[in-house]
Amino acid sequence: GAWITPAEWDSHITTEDFPTGVPSILAVDSSVDDARYVGVHAAVIDNQAIVKVAFVVQTENEMWEHIERIMADQKVQLAITPTLEIHLPMNLQRRYQTVGYGELLRFSSLVRSMILEGKVRHNGEKMLAEHVCRAVITKTAQGVVLSSQKSPGPIELCRCMTWAVALVSKPKQATKPMLVITG
């Protein structure tokens, strides 16, 4: 069935600006037909994730240009699918992780619960809303997962939002670890 209803998604719109200079996740994916590359950016403010569409472009080159621009902020971490990972620039090698079906399986119900509990905010972008509200969740032997096959249209922005929200909401160490040198 439907993952999130339009009324539910719309009830979490915020006018708050997306924060800068805070730890954040940029999740990137390509559409099923590789005709489109998308990125969703997520950060946490006051214990709530805030998400926005970072880009929707037609070529891989444009995608990398957007990724480089956004990741000029050293606090941004990249979550990218294995298909695109092979072309990851050397300067970003230390700030990324791969995400795919396994992570969707782990995070789909978690992020749905976060949305229903009001822990995910967005600024009402139409395309993101369309992808989120058309996404269909299916039951598998391993759990529930967002299904591109069962959804009546593209959901890559929803997939990226799911990865970004789950990863950015993971508790972080507030202070830098101390370097201890012993005798």
Explain the meaning of each model-derived region.
Residues 138-183:
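Charge-patterned, long linear interaction tracts outside catalytic cores
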Residues 1-28:
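ATPase catalytic-site recognition across NTP-hydrolyzing enzymes
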Residues 29, 81, 156:
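Acidic active-site catalytic centers that drive phospho-/nucleotidyl reactions
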Residues 31-33, 44-47, 84-86, 151-153, ...:
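Short, glycine-/Ser/Thr-/acidic-enriched flexible segments
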Residues 18-36, 41-45:
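Long hydrophobic segments that form regular secondary structure
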Residues 32, 36-38, 104-115, 162-164:
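Short, Φ-rich (hydrophobic/aromatic) sequence segments
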Residues 25-29, 78, 122, 147:
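Short hydrophobic beta-strand segments
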Residues 46-143:
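Mg2+-dependent endonuclease catalytic cores in nucleic-acid-processing enzymes, primarily RNase H-like
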